Amino acid sequence: MLTALCNVIFESMQEQKLDKKLFSDRKALFSKLRNSIRSGSVLRAMERVPREAFVPTGERPMAYLDIPLAIGDGQTISQPYIVALITEALRLQPADRVLEVGAGSGYQAAVLAELVPEGSVVTVELVRSLAQRARDILDDLDYGNIVVEDANETLGCPWRGPYDAIVVSAAAPSLSSALINQLAVGGRMVVPVGDRRQQELVCVLRTGEGVSLRMLGPCRFVPLIGREAFPTSF
């Protein structure tokens, strides 16, 4: 019984130590992000989302470092700066409808949902175990305006569109006409385009005449898999 009590005390001390580290890292992260991200609403949205809830237990001590983290199944949760950059480029309005391709554990979707309280976020994921994990995490955090869909042969989720904004959270070899067709006129899509090793983050604005492109900078994402993307390994 004494051993059990000692274990409980030790675990409590370790948890308190971790909480202090997360608090310190979180403060440092947002101080850093304020130097490069102009949108206060984006930063406030990210501050409301507990990133540590979206990573495996072993990765929690690094939850507020400005780095991507492994979430299993060969996938990652994006670097906070990249999440902020993508979200800022979308210029979201409260009632917007948003699509994310590549849910992962649901972190980017949660950030998006914070900015569209009167709208909705649809996020699709090909890896079934990740899709279910994202559902569980988002349900636990009471995100009622997010729908997690299992991805199928169709890229995106056209039956729930059109969308005011689209985020592709994985690297694509080229711009997808299927996704552009799901974007409303005046809507924006942010997608990493390139090869498997290096990409350029591209912001696509759909206009009445076609599309215009703006380059946001170099990036590195895990490759998109499935139709109109890299060959699948599943």
What are the residue ranges of the model-derived segments?
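Conserved nucleotide-cofactor-binding alpha/beta core module
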Residues: R91-S212
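Class I SAM-dependent transferase core
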Residues: L2-L99, Y107-V111, L115, L130-L141, ...
